[in-house]
């Protein structure tokens, strides 16, 4: 099961992802991004503390978020990733994009 929440902070948006971000949750996450992030023009922090699993589909969605933020000249940072997710970000050479 996948869930996403967003909190507006003073200088950024905090997105908390829960569960598994994979091919099965792509539609839910895409809808969340379209409804909650598309029209925002703020820096983004994505908290992965409760994200258990991510596959290549999920990684692709992170790349899309990065590109969207870059177009807006805003940053995106990932925090609290579990070791398995950190390792996947390093193996795929995208960890530097989200620091």
Language-model features: locations:
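Short hydrophobic/aromatic patches at helix-to-coil boundaries
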Residues: 2-3, 95-99
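Short beta-strand/loop segment at the start of cytosolic alpha/beta domains
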Residues: 1-16
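Amphipathic alpha-helical interaction surfaces in cytosolic regulatory modules
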Residues: 21-97
């Amino acid at each position: 099961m996948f869930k996403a929440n967003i909190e507006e902070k003073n200088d950024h948006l905090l997105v908390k992802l829960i569960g598994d971000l994979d091919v099965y949750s792509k539609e839910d996450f895409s809808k969340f991004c379209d409804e909650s992030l598309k029209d925002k023009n703020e820096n983004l922090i994505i908290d992965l503390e409760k994200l258990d699993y991510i596959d290549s589909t999920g990684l692709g969605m992170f790349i899309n978020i990065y590109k969207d933020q870059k177009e807006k000249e805003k940053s995106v940072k990932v925090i609290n990733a579990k070791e398995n997710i950190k390792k996947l970000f390093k193996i795929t050479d995208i960890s530097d994009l989200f620091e």
